[in-house]
Amino acid sequence: SQDKELIHAFNHGIDVHTATASKIYHVTLEEVTPEMRRRAKTANFGIIYGISAWGLAERLHISRKEGKELIDGYFDLYPGVKKYMEESVEKARKKEFVETIMGRRRYLRDINSRNAVVRGMAERNAINAPIQGSAADIIKMAMICIQKRIQEEGLMSRMIIQVHDELNFKCHKSEQYLLKSLVTNCMEHVIKLSVPLTVSTGFGNNWYEAH
């Protein structure tokens, strides 16, 4: 969306959910309560996927009026997001497809349907598909980079599974820190964006421990 407030938050290491809560509730970052942050987090993820005031109210157990105020406050805070959503739908209506950051297409034949329910689903996909699809593009590029580096280094460690934005490895103990450096470098620098890609790592005898 190239929203200035979001870019500033990500580039300065500010927790976006806390920042959203701070602006919506008109309090300082330090005064944001866990409940405020929880509501802001739900709004951050829900609104971009087209959640309604009623849907947000149901999810947060608040009134529809409060739900609408949260959504209105969100768009006032992040006008770039609203612009992105509107432009994504408009472009999809003209082309009947949307594209990811690497140019993969998601065709939306129902975007101009006369059926409001069918059309609404296509409109939500017009907004969501470039986001989710671009995330998929980025992690797949990172996986290619990592596999190439593992082979170049002749490591015994192996990449074994991808789960959403997470990669799991079977890591030989002697290669622990080399693998960490290799993986982090590939994932954080595989593509240049207007905000940093940051990675956290963990080790353990099983997936649970690694978290």
What would you call each of these model-derived segments?
Residues 1-211:
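Conserved catalytic core of nucleotide polymerization and phosphodiester-bond processing enzymes
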